[in-house]
Amino acid sequence: MKRALLLLLLLATGLFARAGEPYTCMQPGRTLTYERTRAGSGRLERTVTMEYTGVRREGGNTVVEYVFTVRGPGGGELYGGATPMTTTVRADGTTEQDLGASLQAVLHNMFPGAAQSVRGTPALIPAELKPGDRLPDAHSSVKTGILTHTMDITGREVLRFERITVPAGTFDCVVLREHKVERGVGRNRDTVSENWYAPGIGPVRHDSYKYNNGNPVLEATEVLKKY
């Protein structure tokens, strides 16, 4: 369950035509809907909605507010239901996602009486990128009661620009690759993902791979269904 959620949080663009625009949605009233399907079978695993509710200034940054909801194949809400979250956009257009704080918010929904603490460094996506750019590592550690979950995201690299078509439409995207290692009670995961981001929107597609005898094997794909 935690692994699936973190993939969403990471939940994380073609030709510089919109260079400088942050890689996130900043439009209150807009709702982005995603669907994750299993590789091979095409089985629906979940649906995610990100309902953007507000934008506010905080120092020199812009804080984007949204409500994050995950539903299972049958439509029932998971992870404690709707959860308020934020993304920060710095003055230079860099998008900053504190994955630890996002996970902390969901776990608070699920375990409202448990003491919590979080630490780490956020995942950053600069507004202007080029193939070959290396992005800073991101780390998080969330403690809920006696349980601790850590995540280390390394090897973050800009692969290419690509125009792709998903159910929500056709988008010019930047493609990022990253290596993620998770540690927690009953959960030890080591995966690589490729992620397509569109300026002014955010995630458009997410492919998750695990390694089998040293070879990457596609596990699942998540795409933007409605925008």
What name fits each language-model region?
Residues 80-146:
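Predominantly extracellular/secreted and cell-surface proteins with exposed
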Residues 18-90, 101, 137-227:
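Acidic, serine/threonine-rich low-complexity disordered tracts
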